[in-house]
Amino acid sequence: MADIYRFPKFSYEDNGTVEPLPLRTGSDKKAIPYIRIIKVGDPPKHGVRYLDLLLLGFFETPKQTTNLGSVSDLTEPTSYSICGSGSLPIGVAKYYGTDQELLKACTDLRITVRRTVRAGEMIVYMVDSIGAPLLPWSGRLRQGMIFNANKVALAPQCLPVDKDIRFRVVFVNGTSLGAITIAKIPKTLADLALPNSISVNLLVTLKTGISTEQKGVLPVLDDQGEKKLNFMVHLGLIRRKVGKIYSVEYCKSKIERMRLIFSLGLIGGISFHVQVTGTLSKTFMSQLAWKRAVCFPLMDVNPHMNLVIWAASVEITGVDAVFQPAIPRDFRYYPNVVAKNIGRIRKL
């Protein structure tokens, strides 16, 4: 059983909404490119910006033609059929130009894709035709990038392995960063287990503008009967002194003194940002890697939910602090469903 503290609405109402990507088609029945920029923190209104970019689009394969070997093969452009949708995160860089220049440079990219496997299924991106607006990101684009397939492709099983695949960019998600930089809690700190401690987790409730059931993301009904989605992130631990039991009221007062502000960004699709504007203990600060602003990309927290809602309207409708006993150190984490060194199963 856990105790819950509900944050007041003003802590997330200012920047807790993301507008949807408009899906409009032109005369050729193709989606019209669009760039969506959202601000996190207090970025400058003009001039140089730090932008985190996520390219959204479709995986396509060449259509099979019946007139192979004819002269028209050399004169007519190759037509493609869509085999899936996905994204390409290219990270943060300092950008000087306009949004429309950036959009055109992104849609002009020639991106080839390969589906492969390591410990899990992966998507390999190889990029050509990098225009001038994208030069700040060119170091990553030229090297090629590999991502977990379940994080960047809605249905990786639909990508053929025996055909050429291209990734056609249609939409660009940008997060303009101000004083708040992108800082993630290191995994070693997020997995930290301390005796006699209380784990502070955040339960984030969202409302989206699309129906998610058919894509495998089941909503829950709130007290008013509205469909909502939710996910949890770990913020840190409140350490109790030996022999002393901290009350729920004490934990709530510690959280209230932090004066947390929440917002949504577009890093990796949808991202949840936490900013500390109040007082923070040294113990808690060390668990946040000495940062007063941290980012939780939904791509890492709940990849499938992120894939389903990253183009939709998203709004924070509630944030709760959940106080739970910290998981004991002697509990073992099993990342694999196959138990090692049991019977005939041996670790290689």
Curated annotation (Swiss-Prot):
Pfam families: Matrix_Paramyxo_C, Matrix_Paramyxo_N. Late-budding domains (L domains) are short sequence motifs essential for viral particle budding. They recruit proteins of the host ESCRT machinery (Endosomal Sorting Complex Required for Transport) or ESCRT-associated proteins. The matrix protein contains one L domain: a YLDL motif. Belongs to the morbillivirus/respirovirus/rubulavirus M protein family. GO terms for molecular function: structural constituent of virion. Acts as a negative regulator for transcription and replication by sticking to the nucleocapsid. This effect might be regulated by the cytoplasmic interaction with tubulin that dissociates the M protein from the nucleocapsid. Plays a crucial role in virion assembly and budding. Forms a shell at the inner face of the plasma membrane and concentrates the HN and F glycoproteins. This is Matrix protein. GO terms for biological process: viral budding via host ESCRT complex. It comes from Sendai virus (strain Harris). Keywords: Host cell membrane, Host cytoplasm, Host membrane, Host-virus interaction, Membrane, Phosphoprotein, Viral budding, Viral budding via the host ESCRT complexes, Viral matrix protein, Viral release from host cell, Virion. A motif (YLDL motif) lies at residues 50-53. A large portion is phosphorylated in the cytoplasm, but not in virion. However, this phosphorylation is not essential for virus replication. One of its GO terms (cellular component) is host cell cytoplasm. Homomultimer. Binds to the cytoplasmic regions of F and HN proteins. Interacts with nucleocapsid. Interacts with human alpha-tubulin and beta-tubulin. Interacts with host ANP32B. Gene3D superfamilies: Viral matrix protein, C-terminal domain (2.70.20.60), Viral matrix protein, N-terminal domain (2.70.20.50). The modification Phosphoserine is found at S70. Transmembrane segments: none annotated. It is found in: Virion; Host cytoplasm; Host cell membrane. It is a peripheral membrane protein. Changing V113E: Not incorporated in virions. 50% loss of in vitro membrane association.
